[in-house]
Curated annotation (Swiss-Prot):
HAMAP family on file: PQQ_syn_PqqC
Protein name: Pyrroloquinoline-quinone synthase
Function text: Ring cyclization and eight-electron oxidation of 3a-(2-amino-2-carboxyethyl)-4,5-dioxo-4,5,6,7,8,9-hexahydroquinoline-7,9-dicarboxylic-acid to PQQ.
A biological-process GO annotation: pyrroloquinoline quinone biosynthetic process
Reactions that this protein is recorded to catalyse: 6-(2-amino-2-carboxyethyl)-7,8-dioxo-1,2,3,4,7,8-hexahydroquinoline-2,4-dicarboxylate + 3 O2 = pyrroloquinoline quinone + 2 H2O2 + 2 H2O + H(+)
Record-level Gene Ontology MF annotations: pyrroloquinoline-quinone synthase activity
Cross-referenced InterPro entries: Haem_Oase-like_multi-hlx, PqqC, PqqC-like, Thiaminase-2/PQQC
The entry's keywords: Oxidoreductase, PQQ biosynthesis
Enzyme class: oxidoreductase
């Protein structure tokens, strides 16, 4: 077992049923979700300057724009039509369609509102190497692991609404360069994330029928929390500690 993602909650015994699995998943979120990361505390508490917020939004774009790619890979793993139909709306949520904008367009409203050129953002040429490695690892995970683990890795959405609420309130309160219009991505996700999380949780509780499968589900969630945490580690190292790697975005005045 990979020590980086090994499931261990206080030396607990193997998970015996679906209810124990859900409790373990929620415990993982309480201990490992990236709302706890110091960078988020700085971001939501108004402790960053505009250039640091720009760097966060720029790097996070790569994650946001990769989500529909990840979800297309998840869909490709299932012969079951009902699961594909249920998962398909996630792609539409982020990509949008001919008549409505999606999450990626809303994220570009954020980066534009922060003063970044959309062409530069979409090129991803200024993102941190660790951002690219972490996000690509997530896409590869859903491609290479079991379909059950692929769905389980999305369960960070269980914990996202509280983070979005904290982000909306904190950033609007503390930054004069932030307004409600450019925060529309997070407001929309307050509706979408619970729906997505409910389906994923029902799926893993139904289909993880052995202790080994329940452990694999927990490890998938731990892996995903590591993906999110690693991105913030890199942002903190580069833009708070001041160690920006060659080729990465350098905010004005840095």
């Amino acid at each position: 077992m990979n020590a980086m993602t090994a499931f261990s909650l206080n030396g607990a015994a193997p998970l015996a049923n679906a209810d124990e699995l859900e409790a373990a998943l929620r415990q993982i979120g309480a201990a490992r979700y990236h709302n706890l990361h110091p960078f988020h505390r700085l971001l939501h508490g108004g402790k960053l300057n505009k250039g640091q917020v720009q760097a966060w939004a720029l790097n996070r774009y790569y994650y946001q724009s990769s989500i529909p790619i990840k979800d297309a890979v998840v869909i490709s793993r299932f012969r079951d039509r009902a699961t594909r139909v249920e998962w398909r709306h996630r792609i539409e949520d982020h990509d949008g369609d001919l008549s409505s904008e999606g999450g990626i367009e809303r994220w570009l409203k954020l980066t534009e509102g922060l003063g970044l050129d959309s062409g530069y953002v979409e090129s991803t040429q200024g993102i941190l190497p660790a951002t690219r490695f972490a996000v690509d690892a997530y896409v590869h995970f859903v491609r290479d692991r079991t379909p059950l683990e692929a769905i389980a890795s999305s369960l960070t959405e269980l914990f996202a609404p509280n983070l979005h609420e904290e982000r909306i309130a904190g950033m609007l309160a503390h930054y004069d360069f932030v307004n409600p219009e450019i925060m529309s991505y997070f407001k929309r996700r307050l509706e979408q994330a619970p729906r997505d999380a409910d389906f994923a949780l029902r799926h893993v509780k139904q289909h993880a029928t052995t202790p080994a499968e329940r452990e694999a589900v927990c490890n998938a969630l731990i892996f995903k929390t590591n993906v999110l945490w690693a991105q913030l580690d890199a942002l903190h190292h580069a833009y708070v500690d001041g160690h920006i790697p060659p080729g990465a975005f350098v905010p004005q005045g840095f």
